[in-house]
Design a protein with these regions (language model features):
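Negatively charged, low-complexity tracts enriched in Asp/Glu with abundant Ser/Thr
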Residues: 1-34, 68-76
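Short acidic DE-rich linear segments
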Residues: 2, 87-94
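Solvent-exposed amphipathic alpha-helical surface segments
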Residues: 18, 22, 82-85, 89
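Amphipathic alpha-helical interaction modules
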Residues: 19-58
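Intrinsically disordered, low-complexity regulatory segments enriched in Ser/Thr/Pro
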Residues: 44-84, 91
Length: 94
């Protein structure tokens, strides 16, 4: 089983491979996100002309990976969640 840092690098490399074709032109960005007393590693997808994106936390993905032991299952579930969340996110003009 991979440690967290290796897992994070693999997720950065492979995440977009599991996203549907319509997301392929987007930029995957991993950024630290400050929460109460903790910093999490967030994934967002940037699309030109869109100012808002859902965030998925690699930390949560790693917990799922530790429980199931299956990287592909973990990535598929995260990408499915991202797709649904992205489609429900409002378009905000700034």
């Amino acid at each position: 089983m991979m440690n967290y840092e290796i897992f994070k690098e693999v997720v950065k490399e492979k995440f977009m491979d599991y996203m549907p074709e319509k997301f392929k032109g987007m930029e995957l960005v991993v950024e630290p996100v400050e929460k109460v007393n903790v910093t999490l590693d967030g994934i967002i997808l940037r699309e030109e002309g869109r100012n808002i994106s859902p965030t998925i936390y690699i930390n949560d993905m790693y917990k799922k990976y530790q429980n199931c032991g299956d990287l592909e299952e973990t990535l598929m579930a995260a990408c499915d969640f991202m797709e649904r969340a992205y489609e429900q996110a409002p378009v905000v003009d700034v």
